[in-house]
Amino acid sequence: MTKKLLVMAGGTGGHVFPAIAVVRELQQQGWEIRWLGTKDRMEADLVPKHGIPIEFIQISGLKGKGIKALLTAPFAILRAVLQAKKIINAYKPDAVLGMGGYVSGPGGIAAKLCGVPVILHEQNAVVGLTNVWLSKIARRTLQAFPTAFPNAEVVGNPVRQDLFEIAPPEQRFAEKGYPINILVMGGSQGALVINKTVLEVAKVLGQNVFISHQVGKGKLAGVEEVYQATGNGIASEFIDDMKAAYEWADLVICRSGALTVCEIAAAGLPAIFVPFQHKDRQQFLNAEYLAQVGAAMIIEQQDFTPESLLKALEPLIADRQKLTEMAIKARAKATPLAAKRVAEVIVENSL
């Protein structure tokens, strides 16, 4: 009989893309996959585009929703659990994989009530509240970084396998001269502080660098004009081919979401991280995974000025060997078998 998996993941690419990487591993083994998500988040469009059937429940976050939302939250959660329970009873999965997002909470509770094993994966270096609760009912808990749970197995973050096809840094960087290719990623929303600061620095650095700057949707205004004037960069709203972008780059400047950190390690690239300022310092702790081994630098957002960025960049631009050493250290922290290992744990713990 065909084995079945129900995947619970949604909200952001940091949850959805690692889950898709695991799905591909299990599909190769003949597993049938179905997804549990919400209609108003990115998984509603993204998952069907990858050929995966998706079911929906109604659930949303409570942050910043006010007193009314807090008072009605128990009823909303109960409704979502009952919706998920109905889907699980109809689909009859052999295992449920929780990868984060609002959907994982009620989905995990419903799976437990239905007697279906829950396998949990935490992508960030600090564990989210939903996964703290779910870890108490999960059959197995896995983590990307060693700092989230004290006793969970560390498997890394499942990332796209094509990134591991990129040649090793010592080979890629061997014949390179100038300019230094800098890949700047403002994220899908466009991090205003990164965009503004990099533009100021581009005016100073001249032809020693060439910048490929992903600014985010609707953020091109004024940016293209700067690079036309400086002649040392190009701007785009999105990057369609991330593998090609990583292969081209000598250095990355970006936020430090869990998936981004692990992709940069997989590609073998030095980075300057500007963590988003979460209360739990989630992105800072993600960035430390590479910074602690000398593969990356961290500049906190409140300190991220043209002066601090120039101070970080100038020694790297002057010393290509330093960039190569950082890149080699980054590649050493990659986890090419993460998706395979998560898939193995699902198989081992399925009904």
Swiss-Prot record:
Q: Which GO terms describe its molecular function?
A: UDP-N-acetyl-D-glucosamine:N-acetylmuramoyl-L-alanyl-D-glutamyl-meso-2,6-diaminopimelyl-D-alanyl-D-alanine-diphosphoundecaprenol 4-beta-N-acetylglucosaminlytransferase activity; undecaprenyldiphospho-muramoylpentapeptide beta-N-acetylglucosaminyltransferase activity
The topology of this chain with respect to the membrane is: Peripheral membrane protein
- Alphabetized UniProt keyword annotations: Cell cycle, Cell division, Cell inner membrane, Cell membrane, Cell shape, Cell wall biogenesis/degradation, Glycosyltransferase, Membrane, Peptidoglycan synthesis, Transferase
Q: Give the reaction(s) catalysed.
A: di-trans,octa-cis-undecaprenyl diphospho-N-acetyl-alpha-D-muramoyl-L-alanyl-D-glutamyl-meso-2,6-diaminopimeloyl-D-alanyl-D-alanine + UDP-N-acetyl-alpha-D-glucosamine = di-trans,octa-cis-undecaprenyl diphospho-[N-acetyl-alpha-D-glucosaminyl-(1->4)]-N-acetyl-alpha-D-muramoyl-L-alanyl-D-glutamyl-meso-2,6-diaminopimeloyl-D-alanyl-D-alanine + UDP + H(+)
Q: Which InterPro entries match?
A: GlcNAc_MurG (IPR006009), Glyco_trans_28_C (IPR007235), GlycoTrans_28_N (IPR004276)
Pathway the protein contributes to: Cell wall biogenesis; peptidoglycan biosynthesis
Example GO biological process: cell wall organization
Location of the protein in the cell = Cell inner membrane
Its EC number is 2.4.1.227
> Which Gene Ontology cellular component annotation is one that this UniProt entry carries?
plasma membrane
Q: Can you tell me where the transmembrane regions are?
A: none
Task: Summarize where UDP-N-acetyl-alpha-D-glucosamine binds, as residue positions.
Answer: 12-14, 124, 160, 188, 239, 258-263, 283
Please give the superkingdom of this protein's source: Bacteria
Q: What does this protein do?
A: Cell wall formation. Catalyzes the transfer of a GlcNAc subunit on undecaprenyl-pyrophosphoryl-MurNAc-pentapeptide (lipid intermediate I) to form undecaprenyl-pyrophosphoryl-MurNAc-(pentapeptide)GlcNAc (lipid intermediate II).
What family does the database annotate?
A: Belongs to the glycosyltransferase 28 family. MurG subfamily.
Q: Which HAMAP family match?
A: MurG (MF_00033)
The identity of this protein, by name, is UDP-N-acetylglucosamine--N-acetylmuramyl-(pentapeptide) pyrophosphoryl-undecaprenol N-acetylglucosamine transferase
Organism listed in the record: Glaesserella parasuis serovar 5 (strain SH0165) (Haemophilus parasuis)
